Amino acid sequence: ETIINLNNYIMNKKEKLEQVNHLVQKLGLSPQEAVEYFSAKVVESSSVVRECEVAVGVLPGMYVYADGLISSEIIEGRRVMAVVGSVDGSDVLAVCLHEACLPWSSDWLEAKATQEMTGGKEATRKLLEISRKKRQEAEAAQWCYDYAEDGVIQGEAFLPSLTELEKLFANKAAINASLKALGAALLEGWYWSSTENGSNHAWLFNMF
């Protein structure tokens, strides 16, 4: 399974909205004048409000749109990028809509580096760094890193850690309900983690 971390994404949205608010104040515009301007540009004011609520209102199963909106509803005309998988304080993970059946490493890569890592993004990059140095394959990690579908930026997705897969499993029902509504692959079966288990093994997680 491929996931992305929404923390920076949400922070960027908040920063942009704060900049807009600062500009409105600097220009001496009233909130009504600002709304009228955006309405004239065919930007729904309700979308801005919903984006403001993202940081405190995100729940597992919500849809993450490529244009920046996070909503509990499927909105016609907008492209869904991922589904929120877990919300743990300020740590928000989202499940991408496509998956692949690949080996962890067809070369039996021994990275000996990710056993204690709880963050899949860091672990994925470490695995790929070592695989390049050793000139050995790390297919699952590489596929996740290269993922660039539905608006996901290449390099942002990663192979989740064992800890992160456990978080997704806790919210499996909500995630799968949204994935099913989109016609995407459900969280079912066995999934590789980026967490190593011993010298030449890695943890698998059963989503059944």
Description of each model-found segment:
Residues 156:
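Intrinsically disordered, low-complexity polar regions and short flexible loop motifs
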Residues 1-10:
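Short, Lys/Arg-enriched N-terminal segments with co-localized hydrophobic residues
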